[in-house]
Swiss-Prot record:
This is Threonine--tRNA ligase. Catalyzes the attachment of threonine to tRNA(Thr) in a two-step reaction: L-threonine is first activated by ATP to form Thr-AMP and then transferred to the acceptor end of tRNA(Thr). Also edits incorrectly charged L-seryl-tRNA(Thr). Residues 3-60 form the TGS domain. HAMAP family: Thr_tRNA_synth. The lineage of its organism: Bacteria, Bacillati, Actinomycetota, Actinomycetes, Micrococcales. GO terms for cellular component: cytoplasm. GO terms for molecular function: ATP binding; metal ion binding; threonine-tRNA ligase activity; tRNA binding. The gene is thrS. Its EC number is 6.1.1.3. Zn(2+) binds at C365, H416, H543. It is found in: Cytoplasm. InterPro entries: aa-tRNA-synt_IIb, aa-tRNA-synth_II, aa-tRNA-synth_II/BPL/LPL, Anticodon-bd, Anticodon-bd_dom_sf, TGS, Thr-tRNA-ligase_IIa, Thr/Ala-tRNA-synth_IIc_edit. Its cofactor is Zn(2+).
Length: 669
């Protein structure tokens, strides 16, 4: 073979010569786990021809990108099956998502669980046919002809140049560059059986999907996520490289369902969501109130120890405040509509004094700025750390409201720190360490950081200030030693932020604390302090929410602990169960000693039999159960029964009280 017929590639970091016209499939022929190629940083189908000098990397099916391709291809197979089952179905979008995929359809009737099982069988037949995924580049006219019976696809073609801004999932269909259609091609006849407008890439064939997939649920969804659009039916599914991986995922999902805080909230009588109040507005029951108070009390004391000062602000304010802050320009869609009040009328009904717009506050920062500005400030007062458990209200769309983790009325553990530029870096470091330490005290200890930077379409202030703020946050994050992940364009309009991402007991990631650096609001509110040289200077402002919101944090902890809260948070820390009614007085005396020591303890004197009382305590996830019978009463002792079913008999009452008090004091899990 002459050199003229060969080209040079960089394959997985090494220079390699191959025959001109070689495809990714040929290059990685011996690596059966490679499903697509990353060519010069862009994912490509394996059947695309490689060119001189290309930097090529094989992407395996079990890698994050490989899993996304697997799931996107499975979504195509599902859509093909749906249009076989319901030929009248019109296609929406069908992207991959975390751990799975979905596809939207315009159909007359919602899909039933029986439909999903039928579709799974039809999908398996398609997979077994080993259909090929074939990419073809088309003109817009050709695309419109191919999609003539798909009105939603035709609409997407009209959004080609701004697909990234249209809605989640749209850019898997159209975007910058070529318009492409993927055909599912019959291997024997070579004919296209089904096609979809799609940017790809895809697997080479359906058989790679194997049988490690499942359709999980269906729901209603508005076209492009806009509630003013047509309501479609969405089918969710998942796909994995092996049946074992699918089973492991399904087991994780089953465990997550058992831990669902909405379910546990009912079972443990912690909180509820009355329809009479409206979507996203929870109420806490007495037991939930105990947990919440314990969370807040501990946080409050830690803030006092760290030099924070407590403030309180109202729930509503004049709209002008949010004009100054910029929220009405940049965040109005997330706010509840204005209330018009204080209008005055003449006797003839004409307006003597027009009404003013008042808003439920979506954030506490503007009000904290007014506190800072209420009098002259000196550099000697800085850093000034203001803290509030502040109630805020945000108009979340009904479709995204979810239990306690996405609500419309919430309480933020909100701090705003005002400091000099010289203090800025040290204060950020101190704040991050404080945040991480406090989260660990609540039982979360697996973290990484995310750095959200400027959204070029949505920001206030000058580029230099943003660059300085971003650089400083990045240095502080890197110095923490935690893994740092970029979040380009994810910042709020007034400044970049670090967010602490925490993993729970199931390995799921939750965004917890946020630390945001802001040079802009001090400018907009004309905040000043007198510097050591007598000049007036602008402070730097740090926004910090540790829990995110109290409601959300409680939802996360409920699932993290599966409702079995550590003793210091548990609403009932001890239940005393006498073996027989004869020992009720003895157990009341023991529980009285515990209550005197500050322990939340009860005696179960219900008419239930002893075994039922034990089961009830277990179901209620009580940390400590104390049992007393004849031998215990004679010896001045009790028997400990723990959550795991183990038991420690004959423990002297004084020692039992000490053990429990120590466990609560030390916040043992």
């Amino acid at each position: 073979m002459s050199d003229a017929q060969q080209i040079t590639l960089i394959v997985d970091g090494e220079e390699t010569k191959v025959t001109e016209g070689t495809t990714g499939a040929e290059l990685f022929f011996e690596r059966r786990d490679v499903v697509v190629a990353r060519v010069n940083g862009v994912l490509k189908d394996l059947d695309q021809v490689l060119t001189e000098g290309a930097d090529v990397e094989g992407v395996t099916i079990d890698s994050p990108d490989g899993l996304n391709v697997l799931r996107h291809s499975t979504a195509h197979v599902m859509a093909q099956a749906v249009q076989q089952l319901r030929p009248e179905a019109k296609l929406g979008i069908g992207p991959y998502i975390t751990d799975g995929f979905y596809f939207d359809f315009d159909v007359a009737d919602p899909f039933t669980p029986e439909d999903l099982r039928t579709l799974e069988k039809m999908m398996q037949k398609i997979i077994n046919q080993n259909q090929k995924f074939v990419r073809r580049v088309v003109t817009e006219e050709e695309a419109r002809e191919a999609m003539a019976n798909e009105p939603y696809k035709l609409e997407l073609l009209g959004k080609k140049n701004d697909a990234s801004d249209a809605a989640e999932g749209v850019n898997v269909e159209v975007g910058a560059g070529d318009i492409t259609i993927y055909d599912n091609v019959d291997r024997k006849s070579g004919e296209s059986i089904w096609c979809d407008l799609c940017r790809g890439p895809h697997l080479q064939n359906t058989k790679i999907i194997s049988n490690a997939f499942a359709l999980t649920r269906s729901s209603a969804a508005y076209w492009l996520g806009n509630q003013n659009n047509q309501q479609l039916q969405r089918i969710y599914g998942t796909a994995w490289p092996t049946k074992e991986a699918l089973k492991a995922y399904q087991e994780r999902i089953a465990e997550a369902e058992r831990r669902d805080h909405r379910k546990l909230g009912v079972e443990l009588d912690l909180f509820s969501f009355p329809d009479e109040l409206g979507s996203g507005l929870p109420v806490f029951h007495p037991k939930g109130g105990i947990i919440r108070k314990a969370m807040e009390d501990y946080s409050r004391q830690r803030h006092v120890d760290a030099g924070y000062e407590f403030v309180y602000t109202p729930h509503i304010t004049k709209g002008h405040l949010y004009e100054v802050s910029g929220h009405l320009d940049w965040y109005k869609d997330g706010m509840f509509p204005a209330m018009q009040v204080d209008a005055e009328f003449n006797e003839d009904g004409s307006v003597r004094k027009p009404a003013q717009d008042y808003y439920l506050k979506p954030m506490n920062c503007p009000m904290h700025n007014l506190i800072f500005r209420s009098r002259g400030r000196s550099y000697r007062e800085l850093p000034l750390r203001l803290f509030e458990f502040g109630s805020v209200y945000r108009y979340e769309k009904s479709g995204v409201v979810h239990g306690l983790t996405r609500v419309r009325g919430m309480t933020q553990d909100d701090a705003h720190i005002y400091c000099t530029r010289e203090q800025m870096k040290d204060e950020l470091t101190t704040t991050l360490n404080f945040v991480l330490g406090l989260l660990k005290d609540y039982g979360l200890d697996d973290f990484y950081l995310e750095l959200s930077t400027k959204n070029e379409e949505k920001f206030v202030g000058d580029d230099a200030a943003w660059e300085e703020a971003t650089r400083t946050l990045s240095e502080v994050a890197e110095a923490s030693g935690l893994h740092l992940v970029p979040d380009p364009g994810g910042a709020a309009f007034y400044g970049p932020k670090i967010s602490v991402q925490a993993k729970d007991a199931l390995g799921r990631t939750w965004q917890m604390s946020t630390i945001q650096l802001d040079f802009n609001l001090p400018e907009r509110f004309e905040l000043e302090y007198q510097a050591a040289d007598g000049t007036r200077q602008r402070p730097v402002m740090i926004h910090r929410a540790l829990f995110g919101s109290v409601e959300r944090f409680m939802g996360v902890l409920t699932e993290h602990y599966a409702g079995a809260f550590p003793a210091w948070l548990a609403p009932v820390q001890v239940v005393g169960i006498p073996v027989a009614e004869t020992f009720n007085d003895y157990m009341f005396d023991v529980v009285g000693q515990l209550k005197a020591a500050g322990i939340r303890a009860e005696v179960d004197i219900s008419s239930d039999r002893f075994p039922k009382k034990i089961r009830t305590a277990s179901k209620d996830k009580i940390p400590f159960v104390l049992i007393a019978g004849g031998e215990d009463a004679e010896a001045g002792a009790v028997s400990f029964r723990f959550r795991d079913g183990s038991q420690d008999n004959g423990v002297p009452v004084a020692e039992a009280v000490r053990r429990i008090v120590d466990a609560v004091k030390n916040r043992e899990s």
